[in-house]
């Protein structure tokens, strides 16, 4: 093969990767959930920015256990992180408070898309999906994610539980 043919192939690959790279870049992650999970507040602030509100509280699990907690609101209240025992263990993402494309996410169809926006595998099979909730369990580094709809079948909010001991 001559050098002109090689250059044409290389240029073709560069154009191909440039086009696909640009389409992926147009849909950035909301944030990488695995980089927030179990992390202390200073690490979370590097990803989500400074909190707009911080409240000392008590977290009550569904099993009746209580833990001293700090609740921090990020991104103008769209993301609430509950810090238990020093780490981000429980998150609530108010999808309808996020800007742009997130407000148009429909339930249940776009629940998988939202997983990808959180840096997780969009092809993960849900453990449960019905009119009230879509649930994924035992994702790498994350115990449970629950997506809840509005009455208009949009995604309303997401609960993320990092470790089952806080369930």
Task: Give a label for each model feature.
Residues 77-133:
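Long, charged/polar, surface-exposed segments that mediate recognition or autoinhibition
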Residues 136-157:
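Short, exposed beta-strand-loop hairpins at the edges of beta-sheets
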Residues 29-73, 78:
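N-terminal secretory signal peptides
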Residues 20-27:
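Sec/Tat signal peptide C-region and signal peptidase I cleavage site
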Residues 165-167:
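Short, solvent-exposed mixed-charge patches
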Residues 1-10:
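Bacterial N-terminal signal peptides that target proteins for export
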Residues 57-64, 126-134:
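Short linear loop/turn motifs
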Residues 11-18:
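Bacterial N-terminal signal peptides
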């Amino acid at each position: 093969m001559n050098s002109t043919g090689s250059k044409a192939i290389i240029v073709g690959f560069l154009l191909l990767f440039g086009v696909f790279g640009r389409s992926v870049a147009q849909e950035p992650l909301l944030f990488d959930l695995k980089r927030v999970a179990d992390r202390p507040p200073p690490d979370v602030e590097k990803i989500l920015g400074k909190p707009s509100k911080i409240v000392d509280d008590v977290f009550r699990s569904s099993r009746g256990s209580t833990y001293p907690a700090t609740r921090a609101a990020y991104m103008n209240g769209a993301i609430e992180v509950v810090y238990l025992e020093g780490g981000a263990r429980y998150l609530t993402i108010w999808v309808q408070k996020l800007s742009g494309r997130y407000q148009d996410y429909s339930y249940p169809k776009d629940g998988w898309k939202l997983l990808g926006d959180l840096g997780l595998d969009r092809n993960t099979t849900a453990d449960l999906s019905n009119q009230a909730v879509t649930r994924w369990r035992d994702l790498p580094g994350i115990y449970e994610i629950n997506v809840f709809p509005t009455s208009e079948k949009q995604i309303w909010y997401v609960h993320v539980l990092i470790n089952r001991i806080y369930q």
